[in-house]
Amino acid sequence: MQGGGPRGAPIHSPSHGADSGHGLPPAVAPQRRRLTRRPGYMRSTAGSGIGFLSPAVGMPHPSSAGLTGQQSQHSQSKAGQCGLDPGSHCQASLVGKPFLKSSLVPAVASEGHLHPAQRSMRKRPVHFAVHSKNDSRQSERLTGSFKPGDSGFWQELLSSDSFKSLAPSLDAPWNKGSRGLKTVKPLASPALNGPADIASLPGFQDTFTSSFSFIQLSLGAAGERGEAEGCLPSREAEPLHQRPQEMAAEASSSDRPHGDPRHLWTFSLHAAPGLADLAQVTRSSSRQSECGTVSSSSSDTGFSSQDASSAGGRGDQGGGWADAHGWHTLLREWEPMLQDYLLSNRRQLEVTSLILKLQKCQEKVVEDGDYDTAETLRQRLEELEQEKGRLSWALPSQQPALRSFLGYLAAQIQVALHGATQRAGSDDPEAPLEGQLRTTAQDSLPASITRRDWLIREKQRLQKEIEALQARMSALEAKEKRLSQELEEQEVLLRWPGCDLMALVAQMSPGQLQEVSKALGETLTSANQAPFQVEPPETLRSLRERTKSLNLAVRELTAQVCSGEKLCSSLRRRLSDLDTRLPALLEAKMLALSGSCFSTAKELTEEIWALSSEREGLEMFLGRLLALSSRNSRRLGIVKEDHLRCRQDLALQDAAHKTRMKANTVKCMEVLEGQLSSCRCPLLGRVWKADLETCQLLMQSLQLQEAGSSPHAEDEEQVHSTGEAAQTAALAVPRTPHPEEEKSPLQVLQEWDTHSALSPHCAAGPWKEDSHIVSAEVGEKCEAIGVKLLHLEDQLLGAMYSHDEALFQSLQGELQTVKETLQAMILQLQPTKEAGEASASYPTAGAQETEA
């Protein structure tokens, strides 16, 4: 048994004396003193262990092999003090056991089970190392601080044969005494979380096992005291089955490819990924460095139209073409712009579909009488119409940017084709073409710049001559147009200085150059001669503007008619009130006269005269108001007729425009399908596919518009129906929710006649005037109803022509309402004659009663 010294005295075994610089110092930490001062029979053979490295270890220095034991012990004591302080910024030295399979750095547990102190130390760059006790020298190439991005170190580490000895220890689980570490994974990160993890490594503390019960009790009491003072209990070390000679041989054989067999592995606690992940990251970084020349600003995205994909045929086939990678690079650069154009066209299709759906909803809510919802839908439809006006159908190949680039590509193709033709006719067919093309392009660049400057100056001179010489305006304008066109061609060549297509074009064969040149020429020529016309012509736009102005006029006149009818209704209520009060006052006057109350009779007479004067003024004002309302009604009828006629013309012209647009779209689709089936250029194939998908979206939009109502007249139809309802309510049916308004003027006249029968001394003149006013009012209403019937007849003819079943049923309901109104007025006019005869006989009856 070792340790024959006195109890509690520090014992240094011969192994410590061999290399005291690597032994465990007695003053590493206060909580470790109790564990190191055990009796000799309770301590195992002292060997090398695992500890923290000092900052000096992480730096290469020439005198590292010549450290004395005193210096090593001093540095270890400082490292122990730093290791006990969780907040310290120093790094401890790690000196430990020999490089054995059973004493290597274990796998780190998952972060979810770490102690809070360990989590706080996770981001601190603490260095540790594993090295052999028999050699104090350190390898300068492995003592540097490791960073997560230093993939070269991990490649060297992974390629080392000595790392194979780490596998058994990485799979070994820890004892129950290691707190805070629950899950052990193989091949985990070689990073630790702080001093607590280093203190809990297997083999860090002196271990001892015994079968004596009093020794086991002593060990348990020492462990409890260590836990109470903040030190983890000791753990059982795995048996060491390897001799030092075998270890030295294994270490030398594992380090043979790297030079010095005795080296120090230095790690960083920031390294969180596993070794397999680091190898994968290294491989992915190497792949990214190889693909660094490819632009990553855009990505290849597909398009939604399956028909365009199927009709493409050989459009995307880049096989057999020179430098297919270059064409795919161009595709990736232009794909986002093509997708933007297609998204705009798809949005227009969505807006058209939404407009048609909202039209149907608006018709339903108008039929249900929910005018608030109808107004909300009308506003939404106006917003959608504005958005649809901002969007425009256009082929992507005719957009300015893409069209300019295709022109530039066509110019480069022409230059390459010319060079290929010259090369084919020369004596040396093997002469390099790319150098000639680059020289030609470089020589033509200064000439193009000079030509551009001269063209700008010439254009300015010609503009001044145009201002001075009006007589030569036509000739100079023609010359200016030619110069502007040439200037635009030169600008196209100078607009893409950073896009070098010569390297791509130079690798194409003459046949491919001829094919691409022909395809580009057809595309640009068709765009210049017959552009993709989707916008309506000027006549159709002017007709739409006129229809909108008439629609606003219909709204204004309808509002005036409705307000006039409301004012007439309020005047009628006031007249009805006066008609109710006057007979009562007349009766009270008669009672006062019969009772000889002449003063009361005089007051009642004055009040009767005042009310009669007010009634006369109201009747005069009501007559003027009725005349104004009648004129507004006639104007409304005329404007609505013009509006209906404009709508019919607009529908005819719009249908003709859609027919022409549909025919042009079908023709364009046929041309694009033919081009896609014959061209093998990837870029042109993708552009033509985008054009084909745009044409398909336009056809879907036209089909939706044909299935539903016309999108340009949806708001006018709703307002038109609203105006018709208002006019019908104002002219045909006198709707008065007030109980007194339910009385017709004839009924008021009958009540007046009934009350006047009680006062025979009243004159019959006012009743004749009332009868005349009522007759005039009834005549005006009959005239308005006649105009309304004519208007309804025109609308019925239009509904029959357009086969609009909903409008036809609505007009039938309005006609039925007008018929009922006419029948009611006829019934009211029949007792009018009887009332007139009775009013004529009232004075005679009154005179007879007076004589009696």
Curated annotation (Swiss-Prot):
PTM statement from Swiss-Prot or TrEMBL: Ubiquitinated. Ubiquitination with 'Lys-48'-linked polyubiquitin chains leads to its proteasomal degradation.
Biased composition (Polar residues): 65-79
Disruption phenotype: Loss of function of DISC1 in the dentate gyrus of adult mice results in reduced neural progenitor cell proliferation and the appearance of schizophrenic and depressive-like behaviors.
Tissue specificity field: Expressed in granule cell precursors within the dentate migratory stream during the first week of postnatal life and in differentiated granule cells of the hippocampus (at protein level). Detected in heart, brain, kidney, and testis. Expressed in dentate gyrus, hippocampus and in the olfactory bulb.
Biological process per Gene Ontology, one example term: detection of temperature stimulus involved in sensory perception of pain
Region (Necessary and sufficient for interaction with PCNT and localization at the centrosome), start-end ranges: 443-852
Region of interest (Disordered), ranges: 1-86, 236-264, 280-320, 706-746, 833-852
Start and end residues of each stretch annotated as Interaction with NDEL1 and PAFAH1B1: 728-852
An MF annotation (GO) of this entry: kinesin binding
Chain spans, region Interaction with PAFAH1B1: 728-852
Keywords from the named record: Coiled coil, Cytoplasm, Cytoskeleton, Developmental protein, Microtubule, Mitochondrion, Neurogenesis, Synapse, Ubl conjugation, Wnt signaling pathway
Record carries keyword Coiled coil: yes
A cellular component term, taken from the record's GO annotations: cell body
General function of this protein: Involved in the regulation of multiple aspects of embryonic and adult neurogenesis. Required for neural progenitor proliferation in the ventrical/subventrical zone during embryonic brain development and in the adult dentate gyrus of the hippocampus. Participates in the Wnt-mediated neural progenitor proliferation as a positive regulator by modulating GSK3B activity and CTNNB1 abundance.
Subunit and interaction comment: Interacts with NDEL1. Interacts with CCDC88A (via C-terminus); the interaction is direct. Interacts with GSK3B. Interacts with tubulin alpha, ACTN2, ANKHD1, ATF4, ATF5, CEP63, EIF3S3, MAP1A, NDEL1, PAFAH1B1, RANBP9, SPTBN4, SYNE1 and TRAF3IP1. Interaction with microtubules may be mediated in part by TRAF3IP1. Interacts (via C-terminal) with PCNT. Interacts with CHCHD6. Interacts with CCDC141. Interacts with FBXW7, the substrate-recognition component of a SCF (SKP1-CUL1-F-box protein) E3 ubiquitin-protein ligase complex; the interaction targets DISC1 for proteasomal degradation.
Protein's recorded name: Disrupted in schizophrenia 1 homolog
Species, as recorded: Mus musculus
Protein encoded by which gene: Disc1
